[in-house]
């Protein structure tokens, strides 16, 4: 589908070209500065220089010559100095945008820019045998939003949960389970037991060298594929995945694959050989395999004792993804503190000859802090675990729902509270630049009057409520004369609804879900202004009421789509 704003730009280029004054290859349409009262502009400096004419004179001549056809989305054409300004035709825009939203439905906002290409997104990636905490939630939520955004851009998207299921720590975990017994619980309680077993064994190991030897034996047995060690390790992995899945289900997270680090173990010797053969790495004096590339600090891909590290497995992971999926992009959603690691990783895989035509992207993010700005940390004893965070969010939302909507059935109130509570957590992560640290501020997160998920969800529910009231009064959605929607607040809302496809493109280009969050917030705000200034059910005429009901329906549908891109539910009632 070619959306209204795309057609508007095409109309502008065609209108300028039709004058015969400017070659097509010199026509570049841009968005004007905020102080210019227009929707798009053609800055004539470049064209005037090539043509050898005065820029202001060229703009004035074009403004006087352009004659848009009757079905064009071009309204007014004016010249201000060297700027040729174009405004949208309000009535035609209203009809075009609202018809597009109705026709496209849940697909409104999607484009085909990425058709035929594949994107791999690496996100969440918790460690096995540990509870998921708020430190995991940022990668999980940002990554899932990027999955939605790139699918909306037309890409085939592979969401991969790169589990931390390998490493020397598993020797301690297996030894601890053999010594003290396996956890008897499920879910987060089981993960807490495993953490306690690990901590207990680690503490006792400091005073008992035999325990350290035992952990080393289990680690070696696991690496060598010992059946007993592998069986115990797999039991631990399965237990951890079941616990994590409970959180993923509540957050609406869906992965295409969950390949852990262990999956790539067999590839590591070949990767090290390739790194040496390509001279991307070299053997140090102590026998370790190291790399020193692009003026980055030296780093290891194989220890002197023959052991491998995260970097080795990450190189193997890229090689596998290139062979298996042939992606145009591989995107890593990982803590900003890992920026150097990814610069080194991308440098060595390119030096090895991999991914020469592939975009390798690290999407970094900041930490979650307490209201007084302190980072949450296990060592500081202020860590918040994910399941407890979600439970707390839903409980707080339930109290608000019960207070405001006591007339709704209990089951519906519970569903609304889950949607609002989980939505608050997701939006709090996505509404600003991911590099910034975020704070858990429940009053702001659950407010229905500010920049919060609850406010956006309430705006959607208000739209649906208006449509239900219309139906109760016997006024059904019907064909309407959309050219009646000329009030300034109607036009601002329509223009903003038309921007969703542009917002999707911008969010993808910047790897920035906050662009969609900002679009949703502005939609809700503009709808609020429209609702205050333009009576819907009590409009001056039945024809205007029908047109405004169509605008309400379009707003609800578009806002639902925007929220879905963020992974947030849009309740019908609140």
Curated annotation (Swiss-Prot):
Matching SMART domains: Arg_tRNA_synt_N, DALR_1
Pfam family, one: Arg_tRNA_synt_N
Keywords per UniProt: Aminoacyl-tRNA synthetase, ATP-binding, Cytoplasm, Ligase, Nucleotide-binding, Protein biosynthesis
Subcellular location: Cytoplasm
Keyword set includes Aminoacyl-tRNA synthetase: yes
Motif ('HIGH' region): 126-136
A single BP term in Gene Ontology: arginyl-tRNA aminoacylation
CDD domains per the UniProt record, alphabetical: Anticodon_Ia_Arg (cd07956), ArgRS_core (cd00671)
SUPFAM superfamilies: Anticodon-binding domain of a subclass of class I aminoacyl-tRNA synthetases (SSF47323), Arginyl-tRNA synthetase (ArgRS), N-terminal 'additional' domain (SSF55190), Nucleotidylyl transferase (SSF52374)
Domain of life per record: Bacteria
Keyword Cytoplasm carried by entry: yes
Main location: cytoplasm
Catalytic activity: tRNA(Arg) + L-arginine + ATP = L-arginyl-tRNA(Arg) + AMP + diphosphate
Gene3D superfamilies: Arginyl tRNA synthetase N-terminal domain, HUPs, Isoleucyl-tRNA Synthetase, Domain 1
Entry GO MF terms: arginine-tRNA ligase activity; ATP binding
GO CC, any one term: cytoplasm
UniProt-listed Enzyme Commission number(s): 6.1.1.19
InterPro entries the UniProt entry points to: aa-tRNA-synth_I_CS, Arg-tRNA-ligase, Arg-tRNA-synth_N, Arg-tRNA-synth_N_sf, ArgRS_core, DALR_anticod-bd, Rossmann-like_a/b/a_fold, tRNAsynth_Ia_anticodon-bd
Family recorded in the similarity comment: Belongs to the class-I aminoacyl-tRNA synthetase family.
Matches recorded under PANTHER family: ARGININE--TRNA LIGASE, CYTOPLASMIC (PTHR11956:SF5), ARGINYL-TRNA SYNTHETASE (PTHR11956)
UniProt-recorded name of the protein: Arginine--tRNA ligase
Lineage of the species this protein comes from: Bacteria, Bacillati, Chloroflexota, Chloroflexia, Chloroflexales
């Amino acid at each position: 589908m070619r959306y209204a704003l795309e057609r508007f730009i095409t109309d502008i280029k065609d209108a300028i070209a039709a004058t015969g004054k400017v070659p097509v290859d010199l026509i570049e349409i841009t968005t004007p500065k905020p102080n210019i009262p227009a929707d798009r502009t053609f800055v004539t400096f470049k064209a005037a220089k090539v043509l050898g004419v005065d820029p202001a004179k060229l703009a004035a001549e074009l403004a006087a010559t352009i004659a848009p056809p009757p079905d064009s989305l071009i309204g007014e054409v004016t010249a201000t100095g060297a700027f040729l300004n174009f405004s949208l035709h309000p009535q035609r825009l209203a009809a075009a945008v609202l018809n597009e939203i109705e026709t496209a439905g849940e697909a409104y906002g999607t484009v085909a820019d990425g058709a035929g290409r594949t994107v791999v997104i690496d996100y969440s990636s918790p460690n096995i045998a540990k509870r998921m905490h708020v430190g995991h939630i940022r990668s999980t939520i940002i990554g899932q939003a990027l999955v939605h955004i790139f699918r909306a851009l037309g890409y085939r998207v592979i969401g991969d949960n790169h589990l931390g299921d390998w490493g020397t720590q598993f020797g301690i975990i297996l030894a601890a389970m053999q010594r003290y017994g396996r956890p008897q619980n499920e879910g987060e309680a089981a993960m807490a037991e495993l953490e306690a077993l690990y901590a207990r064994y680690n503490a006792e190991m400091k005073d008992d060298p035999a325990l350290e030897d035992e952990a080393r034996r289990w680690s070696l047995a696991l690496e060598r594929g010992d059946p007993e060690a592998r069986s115990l390790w797999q039991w631990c992995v399965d237990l951890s995945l079941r616990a994590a899945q409970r959180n993923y289900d509540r957050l609406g997270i869906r992965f295409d694959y969950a390949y852990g680090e262990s999956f790539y173990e067999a590839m590591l010797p070949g990767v090290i050989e390739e790194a040496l053969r390509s001279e991307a790495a070299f053997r140090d004096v102590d026998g370790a395999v190291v790399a020193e590339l692009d003026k980055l600090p030296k780093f290891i891909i194989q220890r002197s004792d023959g052991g491998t590290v995260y970097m080795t497995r990450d190189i193997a992971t890229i090689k596998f993804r290139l062979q298996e999926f042939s992606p145009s992009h591989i995107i890593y959603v990982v803590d900003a503190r890992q920026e150097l690691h990814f610069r080194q990783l991308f440098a060595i895989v390119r030096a090895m000859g991999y991914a020469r035509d592939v975009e390798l992207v690290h999407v970094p993010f900041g930490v979650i802090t307490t209201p007084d700005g302190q980072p949450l940390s296990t060592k500081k004893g202020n860590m918040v675990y994910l399941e407890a965070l979600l439970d707390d969010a839903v409980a707080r939302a339930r109290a608000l729902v019960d207070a405001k909507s006591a007339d709704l059935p209990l089951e519906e109130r519970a569903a609304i509270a889950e949607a609002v509570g989980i939505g608050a957590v997701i939006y709090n992560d996505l509404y600003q630049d991911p590099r910034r640290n975020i704070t858990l501020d429940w009053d702001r997160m659950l407010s229905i009057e500010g920049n919060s998920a609850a406010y956006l969800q309430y705006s959607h529910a208000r739209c649906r409520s208006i449509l239900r009231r219309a139906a109760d009064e016997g006024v059904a959605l019907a064909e309407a004369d959309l050219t009646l929607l000329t009030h300034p607040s109607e036009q601002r809302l329509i223009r903003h609804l038309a921007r969703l496809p542009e917002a999707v493109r911008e969010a993808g280009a910047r790897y920035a879900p906050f662009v969609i969050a900002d679009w949703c917030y502005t939609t809700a705000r503009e709808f609020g202004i429209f609702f205050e200034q333009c009576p819907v059910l009590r409009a001056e005429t039945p024809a205007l009421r029908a047109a405004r009901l169509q605008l309400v329906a379009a707003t609800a549908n578009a806002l639902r789509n925007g929220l879905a891109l963020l992974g947030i539910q849009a309740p019908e009632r609140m």
